[in-house]
Design a protein with these regions (language model features):
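Short beta-strand micro-motifs within the conserved protein kinase catalytic domain, predominantly
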Residues: 162-173, 181-182
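Structural motif in protein kinase domains
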Residues: 180-196, 320, 348
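C-terminal lobe substrate-recognition/regulatory segment of protein kinase catalytic domains
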Residues: 337-382
Length: 422
């Protein structure tokens, strides 16, 4: 049984012209001199490509050719721009009425709801989407929203859910994302109706999910190619979808939310005022907030790395970041980070790992991943690794796991590799 992830909704009509891309082509039978010629067609020295017999026809013909060529080029550029303007990849500033209607005046069943956002699943312009309603951290006008959308919607990665566009009304923004069929990672690890069951019951599915998330976050931080480095600011197991397909993969939800809601603006760096401390409480999620984020409320790449470290420990242990147990009539907080630190320091990683994996995993790789998670959770943000390095490290451990799985392939799936007591 699948249980799905969280989201929000709203609109304004206006399509944004994307950046122009080049189209180039050449015929296979062209000589090298012809290819050099084609590169200089629009050069001020255009006469260099004309043969001696053509040159004899005079400069008037050459000028006529250049003028016609220029007109043709302008016409082609205009046609391409019009075509691109209609492509589905374009970000949309939806009209608020569209979202209001699609969500049945916001009376439709909520897809999910948290203290900071509400989400609906609906159909807009024939597309199955999730609309997320969030409050702005600061006022933003339509022009600025369009400019930010234009940048974010040009990002594409298999480990990110696609942002289609947005709308705004009052102090709220409504973000429209593609709907992805699957379940959030938290529910995959701990099914609310059956905590002893997990769809991620084998080692390769776990490390695949970890690799997908790491690569997606690395893309957000370092590889969008848009001359801007983004911060996610909402990394947690409930914001990651495990797709329902032949192979289990992970997609990070909410990319662009922090940027579009003004959560990453430097102008929002808090003082010692009371309002800033309230922002930390509302915008952060307990168990995923780095120490510096808890004290300042300012999101950074390093606070994202910290949150990823928590998610990695969840994947390995199957446990929640924070939970409470009763002890002598009092509630005692149990921290996954503290339990992991004890296990790593005492050499007890195998006892700490999720029992539902039945010890069928490469212990050395599991310990390396646990230590990597703790590196991401260093209290000093400067000592935390960059996501590019983390993603590369997990990719190598994934390959090691593949080799281990191939060697152990002849064993039954419920065979326990280690016979030693936990």
């Amino acid at each position: 049984m699948w249980i799905f992830c969280n989201w929000g909704s709203k609109k304004m009509t206006a399509e944004v012209l994307p950046s122009t891309t080049r189209s180039a082509g050449s015929t296979s039978h062209m000589s090298s001199s012809s290819r050099r010629t084609s590169k200089s067609d629009h050069s001020p020295r255009g006469s260099s490509f004309v043969s001696s017999s053509v040159a004899a026809s005079g400069s008037n013909n050459t000028n006529s050719y250049n003028n016609d060529s220029w007109k043709s080029s302008v016409s082609s550029h205009s046609s391409l721009s019009s075509l691109r303007d209609s492509l589905p990849e374009n970000p949309h500033l939806y009209d608020f009425k569209e979202i209001f209607t699609a969500t049945n005046k916001f009376l439709s069943d909520k897809y999910s709801s948290t203290s900071s956002s509400t989400a609906w699943r609906c159909v807009i312009r024939g597309d199955d989407v999730i609309v997320i309603q969030r409050k702005f951290r600061r006022p933003i006008d339509a022009a600025e929203l369009r400019d930010r959308l234009l940048v974010i919607c040009r990002s594409h990665h298999s480990s990110l859910t696609k942002l289609r566009g947005a709308s705004m009304s009052g102090g709220y923004i409504y973000l429209v994302y593609d709907y992805v069929k699957g379940a959030n990672l938290a529910d995959c690890l701990k099914n609310p109706k059956n905590p002893n069951f997990t769809i991620l019951s084998d080692w390769m599915s776990r490390i695949q999910i970890a690799a997908d998330i790491a690569q997606g976050l690395d893309y957000i931080h370092n590889s969008t190619g848009l001359e801007k480095k983004f911060i996610h600011n909402h990394i947690k197991s409930t914001s990651i979808i495990v797709t329902e397909s032949s192979s289990l993969n992970a997609k990070i939800c909410h990319f662009g939310t922090a940027e579009l809601c003004g959560e990453t603006d430097s102008s929002l760096e808090p003082d010692s005022s009371k309002s800033s401390s309230r922002f930390v409480k509302f915008e952060g999620t307990r168990g995923y907030m780095s120490p510096e984020f808890q004290s300042t409320g300012v999101a950074t790449h390093k606070s994202d790395v910290y949150a990823f470290g928590v998610v990695l420990l969840e994947i390995l242990s199957g446990e929640e970041p924070l939970k409470y147990r009763q002890e002598n009539g009092n509630y005692v907080r149990v921290s996954l980070i503290e339990k992991t630190r004890e296990a790593v320091d005492s050499g007890g990683v195998r006892r700490w790992m999720d029992r539902r994996l039945k010890d069928s995993y490469p212990e050395e790789v599991a310990e390396k991943l646990a230590r990597l998670g703790m590196e991401c959770l260093d209290e000093d943000p400067e000592k935390r690794p960059d996501m590019n390095w983390v993603a590369g490290r997990i990719s190598k451990l994934y390959l090691e796991s593949q080799s281990w799985t191939e060697k152990m392939g002849s064993l039954p799936s419920d065979f326990s590799v280690s016979m030693a007591p936990r």
